[in-house]
Swiss-Prot record:
Residues 59-70, 159-168 have a biased composition (Basic residues). It comes from the Eukaryota. Residues 1-91, 108-168 are annotated as: Disordered. This is Putative insulin-like growth factor 2 antisense gene protein.
Length: 168
């Protein structure tokens, strides 16, 4: 709806600007290609400028204090609160999540092969679940579970990550 509104508004301004140039009629004459063509070309950038300004104000409204948005738009207020309050945490969280995912993606390449060997190897099953060979994958699974849980842990993931990666 905002697009239509701005296009109509710009069209009205261009109609005012056109009469000294070519035609006093508000609608373009079919035989005059230039006024019709210019009117079609010009509102597009003008509409984009208006939309840019509108999106900026919308972004500022969302980023700004929730008090303004709470009275104007309830939905925008909720979105703005979640974005603005969680932005600081989410950036750090996403960095940690990316690091954990990189670790998780590199390490499972080893794990499925180990698990596959245990499943394909009949010896552990013949010995029973309490035998020694199945225990190492359980230890690896615990590490994998830590990898999966730490990004969700909030503060804990940073503490866990620093000793694991002393270089970074």
């Amino acid at each position: 709806m905002s697009k239509r509104k701005w296009r109509g508004f710009r069209g009205a301004q261009q109609e005012r600007a056109q009469p000294p140039a070519a035609s006093p009629q508000p609608c373009p004459a079919p035989h005059a290609g230039l006024p019709g063509g210019s009117r079609r070309r010009a509102p597009a950038p003008a509409g984009q400028q208006q939309m840019r300004a509108e999106s900026r104000s919308g972004a500022q409204r969302r980023r700004g204090s929730a008090r303004r948005g709470a009275h104007r738009e309830a939905g925008g207020c909720v979105r703005g609160r979640t974005r603005s309050s969680g932005s600081e945490r989410s950036n750090a969280l996403w960095q940690a999540v990316d690091a954990a995912e990189a670790l998780a993606l590199s390490s499972p390449l080893r794990r499925p092969w180990d698990q596959a060997q245990h499943f394909t190897n009949p010896a552990p099953f013949s010995k029973g679940p309490q035998s020694a060979p199945p225990s190492p994958p359980a230890g690896r699974r615990r590490r994998g579970a830590d990898l999966a849980l730490t990004p969700l842990a909030g503060e804990g993931h940073t503490r866990w990550r620093q000793p694991g990666r002393p270089g970074k």
